[in-house]
């Protein structure tokens, strides 16, 4: 179980995340939503251990993650929003490197890498440099690297970015399958339709603070709104989206 308790992050006096508290449980897919600048990415970086909170605590299975950060990271798989990869390596070389850095046993890891490359339709390009890969192919490499060590906690930051329709459907089903097998899955995305299809529980962030933390079904009932998009718009969108779209259309036609 992943627990955030009163987590706050300040940069030079500016509060990026303010008193965030929520729980992501095994077997459950938790959606973490918010507009740009709301603090989602900062929260994800704190959960991965890349940065430390200014206040509050993050626990996994009851233990503060900073107590044994290396051990915690061995149990975590992370797909970041931006695919920063070693472009001079091939997809196969990159995954071998990830396995070695994690001290995974060579033979079973090689078999697992081969299987992941085949199932993600990368096997034919496994010897090509990542610099020649499309964005979707790079995303598949990141997904493979995040799952290579069979992590207990899976953090996904815009994981569908760049994926073709078929791979997107596979990933959607895979996320559900991993949760069903007892993984803790935290899923951050701007694609509310996918979140609504995949997640049972959502946390919505606005102006660095949580404005909703509930099941999607209960939020629908509570707010008397039929879709997650409408719920999100009411809680976290301050702009007149229709009015702005009309102004843009008027401007380009003037």
Model-predicted segments: where are they?
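ABC ATPase "signature
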Residues: 213-214
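A short, surface-exposed alpha-helical micro-motif characterized by mixed small hydrophobic
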Residues: 195-196
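Catalytic Walker B motif of ABC-type/P-loop ATPase nucleotide-binding domains
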Residues: 154-157
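Conserved ABC ATPase "signature" region
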Residues: 96, 100, 107-125
């Amino acid at each position: 179980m992943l627990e955030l308790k009163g987590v706050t992050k300040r940069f030079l006096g500016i509060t990026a995340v303010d008193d965030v508290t929520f729980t992501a449980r095994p077997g459950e897919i938790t959606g973490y939503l918010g507009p740009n600048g709301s603090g989602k990415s900062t929260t994800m970086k704190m959960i991965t251990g890349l940065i430390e909170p200014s206040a509050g605590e993050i626990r996994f299975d009851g233990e503060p993650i900073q107590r044994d950060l290396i051990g915690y990271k061995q149990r975590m798989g992370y797909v970041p929003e931006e695919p920063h990869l070693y472009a001079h390596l091939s997809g196969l070389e990159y995954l071998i490197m990830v396995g070695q850095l994690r001290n995974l046993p060579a033979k079973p890891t090689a078999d697992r890498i081969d299987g992941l490359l085949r199932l993600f339709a990368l096997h034919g390009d496994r010897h090509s440099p990542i610099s020649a890969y499309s964005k979707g192919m790079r995303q598949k490499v990141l997904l493979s690297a995040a799952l290579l060590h069979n992590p207990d906690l899976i953090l996904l930051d815009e994981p569908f970015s760049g994926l073709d329709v078929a791979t997107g459907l596979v990933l959607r089903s895979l996320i559900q399958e991993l949760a069903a097998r007892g993984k803790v899955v935290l899923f951050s995305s701007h694609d509310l339709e996918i979140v609504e299809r995949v997640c049972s529980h959502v946390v919505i962030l606005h102006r660095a603070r949580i404005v909703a933390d509930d099941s999607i079904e209960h939020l629908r009932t509570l707010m008397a709104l039929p879709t997650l998009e409408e719920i999100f718009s009411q809680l976290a969108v301050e702009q007149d989206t229709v009015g702005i779209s009309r102004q843009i259309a008027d401007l380009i036609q003037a």
